[in-house]
Amino acid sequence: MKITWLGHSGFRIAIEQAVLLVDPWLTGNPLFPADRREEALAGATHILITHGHGDHTGDTVAIAKERGLPVVGIYDLVTWLQEKEGIDGIGFNKGGTVTLGGARVTMVQATHSSSMSGEAGPIYTGTESGYMIAGEGHVIYLSGDTDIMADMGWMGEYHRPDVGILSAGGHFTMDMKRAAFAARKYFDFRTVIPCHYRTFPLLEQSAEALKEGLPGVEVIEPQVLVPIEI
């Protein structure tokens, strides 16, 4: 299994026979090198989105049309994109599981908001979500944009993820200290990868507080387009 950061909250996850592009905001992402776009997209099988905000949906429609990839996510957002943009999609909802190239992807709760920009203001696109991605003997908890929430308790107990990809930049999501608290209290991760940080001055620039709060856990600060093998 390989997890590759695309900057901000974007990832490329190669698991089982699937290559998932998660929240692929490439164009305009200050951390993503535009001349390496093909490297990020090569072999992708699905686009997995957590919510509608532009720093997450980003290049979703362009990539879906260019590569013929289905967009996977919350029913409301995916259905709206299918109707508006004519792309393929797999819409489902909290508690549902879809199998993507042998990987089992279950949608779970997050606490944030979800909208896309429209001419008359925000267009609300269903609710925000996280995912449990199971395959190759591992379970990844992809938090999506979220704060700490009590639901993490049963989610950790039921799904037992060993890898956490946690939004931890603060201001719009939990910060590094809160992410460390959530990981300690609700999960038993072997590996934690922070995201939604370093992109703008408003967000946290270092994961040191996360590392300090999780002794005994491998906290990996991702580097853009450098694969992490699990």
From Swiss-Prot:
Under the heading SMART domains, the entry gives: Lactamase_B
Record keyword Ubl conjugation present: no
InterPro entries recorded: Metallo-B-lactamas, RibonucZ/Hydroxyglut_hydro, UPF0173, UPF0173_UPF0282_UlaG_hydrolase
Keywords for the protein's UniProt record, in alphabetical order? Hydrolase
Kindly provide the name given to this protein in its UniProt entry: UPF0173 metal-dependent hydrolase RSKD131_0588
Q: Does the keyword Hydrolase apply?
A: yes
Molecular function (GO) terms for this protein are: hydrolase activity
Classification from the root reads: Bacteria, Pseudomonadati, Pseudomonadota, Alphaproteobacteria, Rhodobacterales
Q: Which Gene3D superfamilies match?
A: Ribonuclease Z/Hydroxyacylglutathione hydrolase-like
Pfam families for the chain: Lactamase_B_2
State the similarity comment: Belongs to the UPF0173 family.
